[in-house]
């Protein structure tokens, strides 16, 4: 019998990176059930190698020939490859950030790895999903794994509460999005492939505009929950505060990356054929997201909640590139998302390391950290300055490219709001830096006074430090090499958007 290289309309080579991770997931499950706990630590290396191999195959596929299939439910184009690669980076760094934390917490490492791989696989499929069924299935795979990760610390009441809130809000947002998809299915004459839906919408001009507005609103609300846009952000601070810190680090970048890829694909493909006013609606959401996220972040006393509201504001910046609906706009969102992964995971890495040594994440407890642990304080300073958009770090150039693309697209008010709120964000980032660099011993927090000074070494002492070093180098070097990165992003978008 002839061996087919196509399964349900998906070229098998296209999903080879996901297949590697599925193999790692199944292997981890089998080993977890068959071996004693003391013999399972090496499985971390297997999954790390699997993530690296998956990323390498994505690099080999980039800018290659896009497979043509009879039922293209999944697209392996350069656009999806770029975002899937970002998710691989986020997962790999999150795994490194998690190992020491989980060992200290005394919970099952294998379960965490299984949930992490499940979320990674769901996010990667979501980046290339090209029909309504695949989109919703991938979204639920990512969502269910994320809910389990949020409630991973079963003995922690806050973690259980975070998982419950995340489940309820995530389920509601998925239901709203599915309702919007059902209207889209009807308007297009029963089509589920995105390109075929567009063909159906072209001939749906006779439909009542109210129905189109209902469809548009439901989809925007559903996507808004996924990327934590205001006013659909209420779940984010509570879930971030209650979930284990490594889980928060992963959710803050991986789910946002997958949500951004889905949003761009739907907006570039379908929205122009629904209503012309969608840009105005998204501009209002983007302005609210940037303003609320940054203003509320100023009042926070917990590093995790502060980074949660910072993550909300970053979603507003990313929306500038999406709303511009230009090649440079989409490319700027991709570039900033890649930079954001490193600087945000690096900041969370510092919070994790400080928490492992002190047991707290309150901002005031970082007081005087520089004199006790200058390396950790310097790393956190670099990440916060990059998040604030201070040169010469990568975050500055990423924001400049975003704002430039918005200005070129005529989004003057939105760009001005972005610049203004970016200046506001510098205040609360610098406030934390100022607290760390106090020199008076009487101003030191009790946690810093009892801080165990680590052994000085040129080599990282833990997986958390390894991930932090990678993020710190990336946050610094990417600012210097920003032009090649922008060129790669532009090439990715130019080769994809006409066929997205």
UniProtKB/Swiss-Prot annotation:
Recorded GO terms, molecular function? Answer: NADH dehydrogenase (ubiquinone) activity; quinone binding
Q: Which reaction does it catalyse?
A: a plastoquinone + NADH + (n+1) H(+)(in) = a plastoquinol + NAD(+) + n H(+)(out); a plastoquinone + NADPH + (n+1) H(+)(in) = a plastoquinol + NADP(+) + n H(+)(out)
Q: Which GO terms describe its cellular component?
A: chloroplast thylakoid membrane
Q: What is its EC number?
A: 7.1.1.-
Its annotated compartments are: Plastid, Chloroplast thylakoid membrane
User: Transmembrane residues, as ranges?
Assistant: 15-35, 42-62, 79-99, 109-129, 132-152, 167-187, 201-221, 247-267, 278-298, 306-326, 334-354, 377-397, 400-420
- Domain of life of the organism encoding this protein: Eukaryota
Q: Which UniProt keywords apply?
A: Chloroplast, Membrane, NAD, NADP, Plastid, Plastoquinone, Quinone, Thylakoid, Translocase, Transmembrane, Transmembrane helix, Transport
> One Pfam family for this entry, by name?
Proton_antipo_M
Q: Subunit composition?
A: NDH is composed of at least 16 different subunits, 5 of which are encoded in the nucleus.
PANTHER family in the record: NADH DEHYDROGENASE
| Similarity annotation | Belongs to the complex I subunit 2 family.
Q: What is this protein's name?
A: NAD(P)H-quinone oxidoreductase subunit 2, chloroplastic
**What is the protein's species of origin?**
Chaetosphaeridium globosum
Q: What is the lineage of its organism?
A: Eukaryota, Viridiplantae, Streptophyta, Coleochaetophyceae, Coleochaetales
Q: Which gene encodes it?
A: ndhB
């Amino acid at each position: 019998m002839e061996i087919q290289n196509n399964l349900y309309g998906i070229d098998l080579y296209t999903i080879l990176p996901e297949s590697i991770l599925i193999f790692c997931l199944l292997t981890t499950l089998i080993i977890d059930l068959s071996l004693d706990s003391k013999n399972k630590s090496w499985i971390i290396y297997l999954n790390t190698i699997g993530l690296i191999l998956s990323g390498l195959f994505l690099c080999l596929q980039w800018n290659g020939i896009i497979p043509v299939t009879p039922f293209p439910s999944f697209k392996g184009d350069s656009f999806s490859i770029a975002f899937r690669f970002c998710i691989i980076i986020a997962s790999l760094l999150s795994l490194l950030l998690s190992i020491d934390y989980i060992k200290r917490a005394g919970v099952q490492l294998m379960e965490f790895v299984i949930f992490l791989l499940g979320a990674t696989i769901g996010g990667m499929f979501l980046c290339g999903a090209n029909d309504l069924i695949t989109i919703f299935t991938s979204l639920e795979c990512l969502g269910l794994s994320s809910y389990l990760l949020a409630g991973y610390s079963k003995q922690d009441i806050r973690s259980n509460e975070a998982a419950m809130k995340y489940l309820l809000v995530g389920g509601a947002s998925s239901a709203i999005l599915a309702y919007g998809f059902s209207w889209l299915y009807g308007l297009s004459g029963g089509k589920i492939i995105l390109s075929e839906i567009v063909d159906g919408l072209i001939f749906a001009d006779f439909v009542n505009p109210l129905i189109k507005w209902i469809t548009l609103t439901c989809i925007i609300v559903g996507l808004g929950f996924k990327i934590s846009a205001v006013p659909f952000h209420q779940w984010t601070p509570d879930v971030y505060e209650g979930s284990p810190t490594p889980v928060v680090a992963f959710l803050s970048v991986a789910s946002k990356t997958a949500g951004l890829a889905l949003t761009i694909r739907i907006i570039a493909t379908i929205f122009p054929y629904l209503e012309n006013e969608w840009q105005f609606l998204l501009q209002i959401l983007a302005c609210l997201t940037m303003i609320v996220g940054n203003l509320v972040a100023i009042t926070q006393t917990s590093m995790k909640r502060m980074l949660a509201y910072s993550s909300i504001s970053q979603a507003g910046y990313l929306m500038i590139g999406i709303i511009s609906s230009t090649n440079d706009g989409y490319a700027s969102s991709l570039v900033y998302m890649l930079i954001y992964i490193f600087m945000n995971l690096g900041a969370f890495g510092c919070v994790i390391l400080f928490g492992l040594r002190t047991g707290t994440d309150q901002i005031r407890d970082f007081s005087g950290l520089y004199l006790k642990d200058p390396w950790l304080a310097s790393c956190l300073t670099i990440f916060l300055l990059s998040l604030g958009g201070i040169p010469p770090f990568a975050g500055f150039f990423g924001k400049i490219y975003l704002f430039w693309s918005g200005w070129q697209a005529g989004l003057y008010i939105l760009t001005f709001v972005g610049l203004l709120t970016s200046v506001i964000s510098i205040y609360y980032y610098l406030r934390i830096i100022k607290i760390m660099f106090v020199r008076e011993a009487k101003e030191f927090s009790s946690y810093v006074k009892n801080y165990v000074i680590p052994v000085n070494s040129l080599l990282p002492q833990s997986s958390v430090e390894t991930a932090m070093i990678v993020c710190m180098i990336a946050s610094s070097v990417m600012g210097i090499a920003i032009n090649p990165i922008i060129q790669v992003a532009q090439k990715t978008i130019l080769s994809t958007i006409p066929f997205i």
